[in-house]
């Protein structure tokens, strides 16, 4: 199995775009047919992250947990305005933050 699409629905689409852009996503505005305008970013050549406006005020899927590998965790935390102290783990430096909708996002900096 290979994941190729993640769709996040939100009532804070611009805040979400800013947050995930700070993590390295490069979004383009899209619209498919009569569907809503949304943002899409291709990650790692074949995984697409899309930000869509919430339908009828539905709550975001706050139970979702995303993991993002970053090059410099301290710089990333500063760029998203988070003051969490990263912890050393067996996988590298790790910090857990929340996106503007409250989803858990785990940041990981692999160390050699």
Regions found by a protein language model. Give the residues of each.
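Short solvent-exposed loop/turn micro-motifs enriched in small/polar/acidic residues
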Residues: 32-35, 88-90, 109
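Active-site beta-strand termini and strand-to-loop segments that position acidic
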Residues: 41-46, 97-100, 110
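Short glycine-enriched loop/turn motifs at secondary-structure junctions
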Residues: 1-2, 58-63, 88-89
């Amino acid at each position: 199995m290979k994941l190729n699409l993640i769709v996040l629905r939100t009532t804070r689409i611009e805040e979400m775009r800013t947050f995930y852009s700070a993590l390295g996503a490069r979004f383009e505005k899209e619209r498919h047919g009569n569907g809503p305008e949304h943002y899409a970013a291709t990650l790692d050549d074949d995984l697409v992250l899309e930000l869509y406006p919430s339908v009828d005020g539905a709550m975001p899927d706050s139970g979702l947990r995303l993991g993002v590998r970053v090059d410099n965790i301290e710089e990333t935390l500063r760029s998203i305005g988070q003051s969490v102290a990263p912890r050393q783990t067996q996988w590298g430096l790790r910090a857990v933050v929340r996106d503007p909708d409250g989803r858990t996002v785990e940041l990981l900096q692999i160390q050699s």
